[in-house]
């Protein structure tokens, strides 16, 4: 039977100094011997998805203490990708994921904590904490801050829903008046919470449900709604039960690697494809799988993408539905229920509540449950009041959206598309693959061939797009923006948004070894692997080269002979120590980012650090 990790610091005469310090934090004799549970918070005033988390750690801690544990809270950093977007700040976003994972490991191992409750929400924070949880493999429950309410405003005598992306597009559209742009800006992000569409933050918080590491409702229940408080109260109680199950009953099923096993990862990716989640989730699931020592690769994702339909369509792929609408339609369990009926899920998995997938669906799928409390929870809706306070309203929809023929969530028979919302493309352009969010691609451009316009930084591409140098039919290529080449693998939300602003959203393609915001839509292909800085073919492309994209056949090709590609590769190698670097880019790269780049792998590996370079 495993010994409590915390006993290392709380038992034995030689630990008198450690106990003296624990006493200085408020612990007493009766606490020594109880499980010490880390409350891993990520409160910050920089990020709307985290601005309301300050008191929620205390809420969880109180429940831990009341249930027989000792709670000790600490904070991680949290970068707001939207605020960091479009300037040098975006270089720091993806590297912050590794820092978060490491900082959780450092704190938990340095102080010998026995278990964790992870209070996350936004883009890199949930993945970073997930990586740490699977690396440490001690009992854990995730409870996120919840989605933001959708913005709303009146334009042309019509009430429309809004989000961050609308503000960005209208702000760059020369045809939009200053007054209208200002109106949209002021209405787009009305409350605390993670941005209201199926962007990266909400996608990842939905996936923690599918992985079994969070409770039903975690991915979709609004940050502002009073019902969400119960998730935090339950997490504090449940983590003590899980902790005692492992340490006192030798029950390894309480450990995250036994909950989030390969079958659960396949279910999570199946959900992601069905709901048209952010392409960033591919990056993060690959990284998390490596931490869990699970053999889950781009090949697995490719296989799933070929058989899973799209059953849910949410902003940015449509403005009709946001996360509040997904919740009304049954949330993650609503989508999983339809996937289960279609025979597309592994059923022999459990979650942190100890329920199997069939048991969870029986209780929480709104189309089958008899539990009125569950139905009431899924009617939790927006209040439409600007606020930064969690649990500040208790509005409810009059009815649930259980229309699986024409509602937000569809059955297999009425799927938005028989092809799922994400696809992996291969070809001489991307030998190790690249990712496209097909949910956001118009049917008219699923096949696209055009001449390349090549840029070696996001900034140059934006200048060209806004300057009218990119025209209908072009394929914009932005390279040396991968994990190593950026460094940091910037998101390309501004270039894709500005293509829309210029009326080119359905007339051009954009390809990059960088990545895209969950707010991106259009023919936007990212994660090209190998990246330019690692010798990828994307580094060899020249202006005017023809690129052929064929999403239905999962192909992306540079239409050059093998001999010409080989000649260009030889010329690149002849540059010596300048090979596989940008020719004309001026970019200040800090020591911290250079350190990250020195170990970074390409996106097909999850952009994790190359352990082979560390030895041992």
Swiss-Prot record:
It holds the Pfam family ILV_EDD_C. It catalyses: (2R)-2,3-dihydroxy-3-methylbutanoate = 3-methyl-2-oxobutanoate + H2O; (2R,3R)-2,3-dihydroxy-3-methylpentanoate = (S)-3-methyl-2-oxopentanoate + H2O. GO terms for molecular function: 2 iron, 2 sulfur cluster binding; dihydroxy-acid dehydratase activity; magnesium ion binding. One of its GO terms (biological process) is isoleucine biosynthetic process. GO terms for cellular component: cytosol. Mg(2+) binds at residues 81, 123-124, 491. The modification N6-carboxylysine is found at residue 124. The active site is at residue 517. [2Fe-2S] cluster binds at residues 122, 195. It is an enzyme of class 4 (lyase). Its EC number is 4.2.1.9. Keywords: 2Fe-2S, Amino-acid biosynthesis, Branched-chain amino acid biosynthesis, Iron, Iron-sulfur, Lyase, Magnesium, Metal-binding. SUPFAM superfamilies: IlvD/EDD N-terminal domain-like, LeuD/IlvD-like. Its cofactor is [2Fe-2S] cluster; Mg(2+). Pathway: Amino-acid biosynthesis; L-isoleucine biosynthesis; L-isoleucine from 2-oxobutanoate: step 3/4; Amino-acid biosynthesis; L-valine biosynthesis; L-valine from pyruvate: step 3/4. Binds 1 [2Fe-2S] cluster per subunit. This cluster acts as a Lewis acid cofactor. Functions in the biosynthesis of branched-chain amino acids. Catalyzes the dehydration of (2R,3R)-2,3-dihydroxy-3-methylpentanoate (2,3-dihydroxy-3-methylvalerate) into 2-oxo-3-methylpentanoate (2-oxo-3-methylvalerate) and of (2R)-2,3-dihydroxy-3-methylbutanoate (2,3-dihydroxyisovalerate) into 2-oxo-3-methylbutanoate (2-oxoisovalerate), the penultimate precursor to L-isoleucine and L-valine, respectively. Belongs to the IlvD/Edd family. Homodimer. This is Dihydroxy-acid dehydratase. The gene is ilvD.
